[in-house]
């Protein structure tokens, strides 16, 4: 009887670990977000128009991986030049708010103060397909005249 209970417990633990591992792989990591931002910087420096087109192409796996994506905006007017949500294109990043949190202004100010160094912005933002904000961090930097970032859920 104890052996049967032990086998059942092991099976349940294996199943639980499999679910936890699968869920962890659905979200990008901090290291992956930072690497994607570095790849985006290289692409922007090589050819800005081609890079922005790639950032806006949801099928481009270099710049769209699970819940990781590149976003950019023009540093002179704050208008989004790259974002997976087409409704945000051309709008001012500084106007972006989640609940009453002035998220866009935080991102803009962090890029402006960090310059070409990589800065971080902590905030709450809904995961894709949800409405409840959860902790997220974005790595942000200035590349030419573009403020760009890649965020990951903590």
Model-derived regions: residue spans:
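N-terminal membrane-sensor/transducer module of prokaryotic signaling receptors
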Residues: 2-154
């Amino acid at each position: 009887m104890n052996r049967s209970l032990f086998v059942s417990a092991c099976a349940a633990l294996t199943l639980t670990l499999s679910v936890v591992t699968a869920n962890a792989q659905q979200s990008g990591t901090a290291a992956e977000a930072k690497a994607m931002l570095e790849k985006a910087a290289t692409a922007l420096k090589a050819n800005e128009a081609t890079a922005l087109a790639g950032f806006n192409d949801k099928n481009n796996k270099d710049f769209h991986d699970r819940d990781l994506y590149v976003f950019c905006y023009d540093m002179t007017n704050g208008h989004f030049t790259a974002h997976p949500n087409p409704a945000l294109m051309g709008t001012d990043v500084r106007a972006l708010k989640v609940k009453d949190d002035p998220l866009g202004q935080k991102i803009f100010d962090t890029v402006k103060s960090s310059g070409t160094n990589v800065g971080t912005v902590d905030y709450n933002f809904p995961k894709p397909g949800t409405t409840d904000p959860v902790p997220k961090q974005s790595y942000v930097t200035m590349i030419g005249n573009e403020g760009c970032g890649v965020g990951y859920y903590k």
